[in-house]
Design a protein with these regions (language model features):
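Short, hydrophobic, well-ordered secondary-structure elements
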Residues: 66-92
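Short, contiguous, well-structured surface segments enriched in hydrophobic/aromatic residues
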Residues: 35-50, 80-89, 120-131
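Charged alpha-helical initiation segments
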Residues: 1-69
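Charge-enriched, short contiguous segments at helix-coil
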Residues: 141, 145-218
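Amphipathic alpha-helix face/heptad-repeat signature
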Residues: 37-40, 44, 75-76, 155-158, ...
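Amphipathic alpha-helices that form helix-helix packing interfaces
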Residues: 44, 48-51, 55, 76-80, ...
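Flexible secondary-structure boundary motifs
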Residues: 93-168, 176
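Short, flexible helix-adjacent loops and helix caps
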Residues: 53-60, 88, 92, 174-178
């Protein structure tokens, strides 16, 4: 880490070049926004290298190291989600709708027995198919069910568990006094995340050369 100091006069540490990450990432034919995906992939992989260097080399408090684990997992899951999203869109398997909300009508409150009720009616018009939101759980299920990637089925189950940790990006979500970040992220989660990410990035559908991801095995 000393080489990263602005006062350092020696050779600086640099992550793997952006161009190498871009060139190494394979995407399915028909993937939309390939340039943006490759760019964001490269930037976030560089960031993971930097986070991993901090975790490996810095002497930090238990709170700070825990927060680095959290950041690493959030970024890594984001990379996987982007690749799964791109794959489903390329394969024309992304969730679509042919209806668009036109208007909503609401009634006034009415008495019904001992309750106060109101009705709300949504009116839709039929349109050409368009993409709608698809959550990460749905992406994982679709990728697995269709067998789009050369991955063991156990990878998907493990990924779902890690996905729950990614949801802790929402700081207000908790289930009790002890349900906080410090109690939810640890070195095992971090190691687990690296292994899963390595498996996904080196599968033949995404990878030209697995050697570039060797740092994930450290």
């Amino acid at each position: 880490m000393e080489t990263l100091l602005k006062t350092s006069t020696g050779e600086h540490w640099y992550p793997t070049a952006v161009s190498r990450y871009k060139d190494n990432l394979k995407l399915f034919w028909g993937t939309p926004n390939k340039n943006q995906i490759r760019s964001n992939f490269a930037y976030n992989m560089q960031y993971l290298e930097y986070l991993q260097k901090q975790i490996s080399e810095l002497r930090l408090s238990s709170v700070l190291i825990t927060m680095l684990y959290k950041t690493y997992i959030i970024v890594a899951i984001g990379i996987i989600e982007m690749l799964f999203s791109a794959t489903l869109k390329a394969k024309k398997l992304w969730k679509t709708s042919t209806y668009e909300l036109l208007l909503t009508t609401k009634s006034n409150l009415q008495n019904y027995e001992d309750k106060r009720l109101k009705t709300e009616v949504n009116i839709y018009k039929q349109v050409e198919p368009y993409l709608i939101d698809m959550d990460f759980d749905s992406m994982i299920k679709k990728i697995e069910d269709k067998g789009l990637l050369s991955l063991e089925h156990s990878i998907y189950a493990k990924l779902k568990k890690l996905k729950k940790l990614r949801n802790r990006v929402h700081l207000q979500v908790c289930k009790g006094d002890y349900d906080h970040d410090y109690n939810n992220f640890n070195s095992d989660d971090y190691s687990y995340m690296k292994k899963i990410l390595y498996k996904i990035l080196t599968c033949p559908e995404f990878c030209n050369n697995a050697e570039i991801y060797n740092f994930l095995e450290n």
